[in-house]
């Protein structure tokens, strides 16, 4: 086994580290629920607004691209102002589009605008990573980042709870999420604390982003994260539509199964971080992506949902979750502390963009071919390429500091 560089310390994190980790994870989950509010209702919006497969895919994908790109400036702003400012601020601002969805739901154009603004909820990832990274020493960092990554469970919350709440009133999911975000913003304002000795960059935002962008490892990690986390996001926003269209499930059943997929990714993300504290994270990433490649190609042959299709999706979820955790363990290992927020923003943005494209591709492929097989073949090819690159290149830079 390949072990990590000896720089890692076994010093026990302070109690404040665990408090910040817990509060940040809750915030990540709630804002991700808001970010993913449209996806579980995508088929309902498609029927209500008479949308084509492509337009329905575009509607659920808009928050993904905005949230992804927004991580770049939000990550850099977190480097400068800290999570104590940014977490309450972003949580409070996300309430606005959540409530705007209520009057906008009968217009495709208005819902596109709401989706654009909901993207704000997807940026908190770039706030939490530098916060957790600063509080935990290297020997505990991979697992801690994996625990924070469990906030992706907000997608599962959305998939499971949103359609069920909507049965009791179309406005109910949006009202509940808005109240939860308001309560969390107040909680974060009181409980989140930035590490007193954290380095605060003084250079302009554009300069810091430029410095992060010039690091080769930024783009290498971005590519790997686009496959791992991008796959999670893509399935999170499109799996309900796929299950409804191909396997003819009703929206509630489709949302429940999509939530199960998301739960598995959430469980395996800290496992990926934990393994990366013990084995080189590039090796963990390569193995996880190999699993994704194998079961994506099996799903391309359109097996019955029970049991083979379900097994394929759950094992892909395990691989994607593990890869997401291990890639960010590698980010924290090779990135200088003052640049973690900026690099995280870029890597998170590219990862999120990796989740924007597949729903559009899947919708376009289905419209043209009445089949999703080509889409799963493409996923298998990308995962295999990431596996080879992670094992062949990224293992050699684990102990470097740019």
What are these regions (language model features)?
Residues 4-15, 195-222:
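Juxtamembrane intracellular "pre-TM" segments in multi-pass secondary transporters
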Residues 38-39, 217-270:
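Extracytoplasmic gate region of multi-pass secondary transporters
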Residues 69-107, 276:
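Conserved MFS/SLC helix-loop-helix module at the cytosolic interface between two early adjacent transmembrane helices
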Residues 114-151:
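Cytoplasmic helix-loop-helix junction between adjacent transmembrane helices
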Residues 123-136, 322-336:
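Intracellular juxtamembrane helix-capping segments at the cytosolic ends
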Residues 141-162, 348-358:
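Glycine-rich segments within core transmembrane alpha-helices of 12-TM secondary carriers
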Residues 147-192:
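Helix-loop-helix hairpin linking two adjacent transmembrane segments in secondary transporters
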Residues 279-327:
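C-terminal transmembrane helical hairpin of 12-TM major facilitator-type secondary transporters
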């Amino acid at each position: 086994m390949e072990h990590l560089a000896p720089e890692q310390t076994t010093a026990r994190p302070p109690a404040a580290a665990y408090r910040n980790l817990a509060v940040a994870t809750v915030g990540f989950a709630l804002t991700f629920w808001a970010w993913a509010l449209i996806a579980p209702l995508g088929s309902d919006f498609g029927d209500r607004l008479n949308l084509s497969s492509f337009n329905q895919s575009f509607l659920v994908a808009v928050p993904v691209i905005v949230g992804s790109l927004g991580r770049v400036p939000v990550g850099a702003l977190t480097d400068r102002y800290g999570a104590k400012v940014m977490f309450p601020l972003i949580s409070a601002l996300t309430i606005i589009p959540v409530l705007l969805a209520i009057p906008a739901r009968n217009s495709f154009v208005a819902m596109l605008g709401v989706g654009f603004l909901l993207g704000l909820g997807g940026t908190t990832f770039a706030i939490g990573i530098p916060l957790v990274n600063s509080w935990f020493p290297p020997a505990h960092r991979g697992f801690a980042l994996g625990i924070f990554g469990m906030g992706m469970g907000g997608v599962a919350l959305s998939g499971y709870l949103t359609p069920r709440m909507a049965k009791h009133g179309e406005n109910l999911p949006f009202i509940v999420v808005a109240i939860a975000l308001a309560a969390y913003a107040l909680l974060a304002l009181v409980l989140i604390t930035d590490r007193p000795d954290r380095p605060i960059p003084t250079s302009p935002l554009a300069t810091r982003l430029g410095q992060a962008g010039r690091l080769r490892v930024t783009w290498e990690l971005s590519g790997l994260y686009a496959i791992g986390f991008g796959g999670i996001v893509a399935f999170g926003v499109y799996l309900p539509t796929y299950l409804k269209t191909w396997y003819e499930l009703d929206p509630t059943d489709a949302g429940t199964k999509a939530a199960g997929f998301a739960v598995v990714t959430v469980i395996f993300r800290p496992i990926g971080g934990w393994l990366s504290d013990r084995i080189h994270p590039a090796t963990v990433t390569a193995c996880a992506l190999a699993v994704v490649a194998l079961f994506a190609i099996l799903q391309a042959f359109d097996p019955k949902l029970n049991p083979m299709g379900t097994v394929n999706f759950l094992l892909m979820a395990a691989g994607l979750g593990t890869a997401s955790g291990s890639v960010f363990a590698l980010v924290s290992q090779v990135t200088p502390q003052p640049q973690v927020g900026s690099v995280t923003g870029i890597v998170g943005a590219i990862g999120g963009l990796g989740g924007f494209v597949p729903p559009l591709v899947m919708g376009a492929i289905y419209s043209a071919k009445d089949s999703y097989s080509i889409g799963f073949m493409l996923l298998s090819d990308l995962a295999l390429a990431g596996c080879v690159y992670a094992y062949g290149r990224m293992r050699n830079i684990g102990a470097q500091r740019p």
